[in-house]
């Protein structure tokens, strides 16, 4: 059988650069070398594209991958049919690429930017297309679409950089008039809980908004929802399939960046500790959100389940983590799809889309 040429993109000019390196290491180690010619292409924090020439993918999370002597400068050409270009001395090497697997998170990576380049180049790629990627990355747009789809979610308030600069007092008063403390403060366009904070009083709210505005010009203030954090992995194009539910006990104030990637205090429960009826409701809502957002390929959909059984939508991630401890692959492994088979399925869905 003819091998497919798969370009795995990782890194990126993003606040979630390091998370991407961890995810990419896992993906590259699990892709079947008998089925695929693999081209690992990293984007540095400065925006340089590098065709990684090493064999040890552990160099990615170690941060030493850029120093590999066999690396070459690279680019994906927007010209259809040109594929992957790499540069060595005065020579340009062209490689046909059958599919791109973006293992990148956050701004410039998960928000439709990379997807737009691949769309122009005519190269199939894993994950949702441009419009869905952009909509899912912007939490305000996600909120509006989920609301139109009739999905219960936390009440929220938008604070903009311009409005906050014009009058902090008005912005803080508006939030306090609507919500009781604590509240969550989230940049509109980041993932992995980057820039997210829980504010318990006015001074903490002001500081959290200031910090979040460093990541995005729009910030969401959300009511605090007390409940179990439940996640569902979704796979598919026209007929998406939802995995079993998983639950996260963060062991912290909330499931922030440190709890996800640094601390070992979080505990995962697969399946989630919820009733069978609630499980089916969560899975149905996950697919409803997935379809409403126009997703294809994959996404992870996150919810809260309150003590009375009410299910509240939290957010959707179009390129979920693929690290060794990430929920997306773990949920499908528990649903009967091993990690390597999941990668095969995602590549097949990309070629079908």
Language-model regions: role of each:
Residues 2-10, 14-15, 21-25, 90, ...:
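Active-site nucleotide/adenylate-binding loops and adjacent lid/helix of ATP-dependent enzymes
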Residues 200-284, 305-312:
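Phosphate-binding site of ATP-dependent enzymes
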Residues 1-131, 135-137, 141, 160-170, ...:
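ATP-binding N-terminal substructure of ATP-dependent carboxylate-amine bond-forming enzymes
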Residues 38, 124-125, 153, 183, ...:
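Hydrophobic beta-strand scaffold residues
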Residues 2-4, 10-13, 150, 174, ...:
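ATP-dependent carboxylate activation and anion-phosphoryl transfer catalytic cores
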Residues 116-125, 201, 206, 334-335:
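A glycine- and small-aliphatic-rich helix-loop capping segment at beta-alpha/alpha-beta transitions
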